[in-house]
């Protein structure tokens, strides 16, 4: 299901949000309205003078999401108001493809380079900034949203509050799965993505 400038307040089966080649000065505000009105709201702002462009492709898998995000330099903020307006609690896992991502949560700051994985908590305030790689106009990441209920025997709040795993420390099976997601995300069918997600 494609959404032109808006998302629903419940988890949809699929989300495609793209500014395309639009150069409208309202493009960022339209995107922000979508993010604030979603089932897991975020706030934020654009950084710099570049025209705002973003593309999000995501699919609902089991009770979570797998997606790819390509964006110009932005700052995304998860406020207490955003958290209270959310319809669920998730663990985020962000696999950096290119560019630099800075995560601030739980009094920690983690800078993610390509190949790094950062895990953070939807139930705590957070700030995430994206900076394009040299020679590119965007940064890119594979993002997973996993319900906290998937970890019944773990203290999710203690275990997933802003943890960076550098690429050289990723376990081989996990690294292979993330790289497969990177390569297959644009064309894979839902069942195939679900198998990788599991």
Summary of predicted features, one role per range:
Residues 2-51, 100-198:
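Alpha-helical bundle regulatory/interaction domains
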Residues 28, 48-52, 59-62, 86:
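Generic structural signal for well-ordered secondary structure
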Residues 33-35, 53-76:
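A short glycine-rich, His/Asp/Glu-containing loop-to-beta-strand
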Residues 56-57, 81-84, 108, 132:
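Short, flexible, glycine/charge-rich loop motifs used to bind or transfer phosphoryl groups or to couple energy/partner
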Residues 57, 65-67, 91, 138-142:
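Short beta-strand micro-motifs in enzyme catalytic cores
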Residues 62-64, 71-76, 81-103, 116-117:
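Glycine- and acidic-residue-biased ligand/ion/polar-headgroup-sensing regions
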């Amino acid at each position: 299901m494609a959404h032109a400038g808006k998302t629903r307040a419940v988890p949809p089966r699929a989300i495609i949000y793209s500014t395309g080649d639009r150069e409208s000065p309202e493009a960022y505000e339209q995107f922000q309205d979508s993010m604030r009105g979603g089932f897991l709201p975020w706030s934020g702002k654009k950084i710099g003078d570049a025209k705002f462009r973003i593309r999000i492709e995501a699919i609902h898998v089991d009770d979570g999401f797998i997606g790819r995000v390509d964006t110009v330099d932005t700052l995304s903020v998860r406020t207490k108001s955003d958290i209270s307006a959310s319809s669920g609690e998730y663990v985020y896992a962000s696999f950096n493809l290119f560019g630099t991502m800075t995560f601030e949560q739980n009094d920690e700051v983690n800078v993610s380079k390509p190949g790094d994985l950062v895990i953070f908590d939807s139930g705590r305030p957070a700030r995430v900034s994206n900076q394009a790689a040299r020679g590119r106009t965007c940064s890119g990441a594979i993002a997973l949203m996993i319900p906290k209920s998937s970890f019944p025997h773990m203290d999710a709040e203690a275990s997933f509050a802003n943890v960076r795993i550098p690429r050289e420390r990723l376990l081989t099976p996990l690294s292979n799965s993330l790289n497969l997601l990177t390569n297959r995300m644009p064309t894979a069918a839902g069942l195939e993505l679900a198998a990788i997600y599991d």
